[in-house]
Amino acid sequence: MTTQRHYSPIDRLLLQADAAMRTLLPFSGQPYRPSPAIVQPDVQMSDEDIRHVAGLMRINHTGEVCAQALYQGQALTAKLPQVREAMEHAAEEEIDHLVWCEQRIHQLGSHTSVLNPLFYGMSFGIGAVAGLISDKVSLGFVAATEHQVCKHLNEHLEQLPAEDEKSRAILEQMRIDEEHHAESALEAGGFRFPAPVKFGMSLLAKVMTKSTYRI
């Protein structure tokens, strides 16, 4: 029989600080799975295509920074232990996406967004508030967020140059994982958000995508 470890409030704050550092510091996280891009060939692309792909991958990287913060904020305030554990497990899986995107960005000779700390803080706060309201709302927010991420991934897959199989392999695996996270959150009892709430979330997402494409 397994025993569940109980953390003090100070312990949890230290864990959150550690998670933030691992998310925001370059190459500080290690993926649990190797990047899908490894087995894909290196190809020559025009400077314009390289800049565009780097911008898309920067958006996706910041999206994963937000996902990390969202899950950590929810884990901090989740009421049921099993929900807290689910959030922490999902955050671990998202580390793969975070590192894959960062690796690809650097391969393209570019940089991650300087706005990541700002978006991390905002997302952490949103996640913590959602967790305080109820676990049902918290899980529903995960599902709605992941569906929004899948929408962006589909759009980015359409914009990638045909020859860029490395970025494509990463985004396709990310889409599979995000769809699974969304369905798992709903199956666990997540609230299905109404259309107006989803619309508001999409507007916030546009702010993130427009700003991080270049910086």
From Swiss-Prot:
SUPFAM superfamilies for the chain: Ferritin-like
Name of the molecule in the record: 3-demethoxyubiquinol 3-hydroxylase
Binding residues annotated for Fe cation 2, in chain numbering: 94, 146, 178, 181
EC number assigned by the record: 1.14.99.60
Biological role stated in the UniProt entry: Catalyzes the hydroxylation of 2-nonaprenyl-3-methyl-6-methoxy-1,4-benzoquinol during ubiquinone biosynthesis.
Protein family membership: Belongs to the COQ7 family.
Keywords, in A-Z order: Cell membrane, Iron, Membrane, Metal-binding, Monooxygenase, Oxidoreductase, Ubiquinone biosynthesis
Cofactor: record remark: Binds 2 iron ions per subunit.
Coiled-coil annotated residue ranges, if any: none
GO BP of this protein: ubiquinone biosynthetic process
Keyword Transferase: no
InterPro entries in UniProt: COQ7_proteobact, Ferritin-like, Ferritin-like_SF, Ubq_synth_Coq7
Chief location: membrane
MF GO annotations: 3-demethoxyubiquinol 3-hydroxylase activity; metal ion binding
GO cellular component: plasma membrane
Cellular compartment(s): Cell membrane
Binding site for Fe cation 1: 64, 94, 97, 178
CDD domains according to UniProt: DMQH (cd01042)
Pathway given in the UniProt record: Cofactor biosynthesis; ubiquinone biosynthesis
Top-level taxon of the source organism: Bacteria
